[in-house]
Structure formats: C-alpha cells, structure tokens
Amino acid sequence: MRKLIFLFIIINSFVFTQWVQNERATKTTAGNLVMENVPSIPVEIKEKSRRYSNIRSASFRSWTQDGKEMLIATRFGETTQLHKINQPLGQRKQITFYDEPVGGGYFSKDKTKNGFLFSKDTGGNEYWQVYYYDFNQGKETLLTDGKTRNSIGGWSNNGKLFAFSSNKENGVDMNIFISDLKGNEKQLFSEKGSWSAIDWSVDDKRILVRRYISINESYMHFVNIEDGKMNQFNQSKDKISYGSGKFSKDGNGLYYTSDESTEFRHLRYYDFKSKNHSIITKDIKWDVRGFTISENGKYIAFVTNEDAISKLYVLKTKDYKSVKIPSLPIGQISGLKFNPDNNRLALTLNTPKSPGDIYVVNIKKRMLTQWTESEIGGLNNDQFVVPELVHVNSFDGLKVSGFLYRPKTKGPHPVIISIHG
C-alpha cells in the first residue's frame, strides 16, 4: 500500500511539474509584448506569410538633369534605398546603402552639380538630416548639423541653393533655412509652429511656405529671400486647408490647391497682377491630391481622389483644355513629375495586382510605359483579387463607398471589414 501511495505521489508530482512547465510555456515575451495562452504559429503559415512580407514596391523620386535616367526608391534588404534606372524595365543600380530608410532624391538644375539631395535619420530616432550625394566623388556629404530634425524643401530654380525646414533654433518650431552645398546657410524667419518650404519663385527671390495647423487648417506665405519679410497669401477669416502650391513658369501667378468655400480641395490659380482667384477644377467634384507643371509651363497634370480611386488629368495651361492621355490601371497615383523634355510624365501607381511601380505617360504619343516591375515574393498576381467599388446607404441616408473583395473560391468564407475614416 505504501508503495502504491509513493508511486501515486511520484506520478502526480510529475504531472504537476509538466503542468507548471506548460503554464510557463504559454507565456512568452518579445520586447514590450507579453503573450499569454497564445498558440505558436505553425511553420507552414509562417512560410506563407513570409512571401507576402517580401513583396517590394518602387516609387518615383526625380529625373536626372538630362532626363535620360530616373532616381527611384525601392527596398532590397531591410530598408528602402535610392536606385538609378536608365530605361523601361532596366536594371536598377543601387546608389545608397544604409541601415535606415532614405527619403528625398532631388537633382539640382545647376549643370555644374552632378548629384542629389536626400535625407535619413540614425537608428530610427526621427532626427532626419539632409545629405548631398556627389556622383563624381561617389560619396555623400552631411549638410545639416546632425542633431536636429530637418526636412528638404527643394532646390532653387538656378540650382545653387536649397531650402529646408529645421527645429535647430529651439528644438520645437520648424522654421525655414536656405543653404548652398558649402554650408553657407541663412535662416529666413523665426516663427512658432511647423513650417515647410513649398516652391521657389521663377526669379528665386521668394519662397512659398506653408504653416500646418491641422488637416483642416493651414496658411501659406510668401517670404523674401533677401530680408525674410513675410506676406500671407489669401488672408481670410475662415479656416482654409491648403495643399500644394507652385509658381507659374511665366512668373505671373500661383497654382495651388485649397478647400476654400467648397466641399472639395480644388486646383486654383491666383493672378498676381489682377489679384483674381479662379477655380480650375470647379466641374470636378472630388479632391485634388497633387499636381505638377511641365518645365515650359505648357502642361499641368493633377490627380483626383474619386471614390478612393486616383484619376489622372493633363490640361493645357493656356486654356485649361484637357489633353488626351492613355488609360491607366485602376489604383492609387502619386509622385507626378514631368521630364525635362516637357513631354513625358512620370508617376507611381499602386494597383490591386501590383504593390507600387513606376510608369511614364508620353503625352505626345499618348503611350503608357512601365519602367519598373517590382517583385511580389514569388506569388502569382493572377490570383490577386481586383475589388469592385460598391456604395451602401448609411444610417443618415448618405452613401458610403467601399471596395468589396470577392474570393475566387467557393465559400463559406470569413469576412473582414476594415473601416478607413
């Protein structure tokens, strides 16, 4: 009997030990994340998900001075870096090699400069610095102090100076500075808030700057380079949300986007001489998300957000008549920029079957050319579902748009509802 009791104690002790070990095994820690009673992920599921995490994309950054090549951003390895490509679907040549992702990538128009501006931080600290990469020397130069937060504002039209925002004055407010590549910099003004440089005037004597308050409120000012004097653009008692702004190539006016007195953010033009504001896209009842102007000022291209689908328009600036362009796949368009030849328009296009690639629209030939074809982790994009645009009535009678992804296989299937406000 004692032997049985002793054996019972041993068995129960073993079971209790295993139970304790199992209980401990259900609690795991990964950094600040503590998981309890979460089952381990099967290896086969990890392998399937890994293919999706290895999907790459490419985004357009800028054309080279001669317009024969372009600078793009894509990820090889862990972070997004800058690459150069010289023909459609050509081999990408990596230029930057950093542990941190790289932003910017803007060439100067100064023919004596063979390089571009870019930005990056260190170790994810979000203290972005401005650098210049010189192709002749094959190396980069730090242009900011290495300690503060900075943002590139673009080159002057003559390509000798560049503007940038920095909080170097007090560590909080982002003010505007201009500098050359030798470090001769100048602070244009000292104001509270977050300011960014939007565009240089044709004669490089003024910079258009914007102070961002919120998604519904922002202000734009003209700043004189010589003395830093500021003049607010379009003073109003109403709260206005401004998007981008660009001086017309003839120097006679300003193209800009705003939602002033309208439900949508329209593309507008302000005439410096007559002081008149005109709405270019008054017949388009959607937000204008971005625009660009050809170097000769002949064309203006812009993108609207129409039920969450991007639509590209190209107009002649002399009469705002539409220019016929080739059809684009349905998706999200960004990064518009005309080639120096004034005929080709580069853009980044994200579609349901492609995570993001670069296309070029030839306006004269009405032809669309794909310049990059990003890897999709070995997946077959023929199996990707193209969603359909649907509209449903909300509780207040308004129509709400959405995208419905229908599985290609027979159901029943689980349903995922993702709300974007």
What are these regions (language model features)?
Residues F60-E69, F76, G105-G115, G153-L161, ...:
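Blade-terminus and WD-like Trp-Asp/Gly-His loop motifs, strongest in beta-propeller folds
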Residues F76-T79, D121-E126, N167-V172, I213-N216, ...:
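Short glycine/acidic-enriched loop and turn motifs that connect beta-strands
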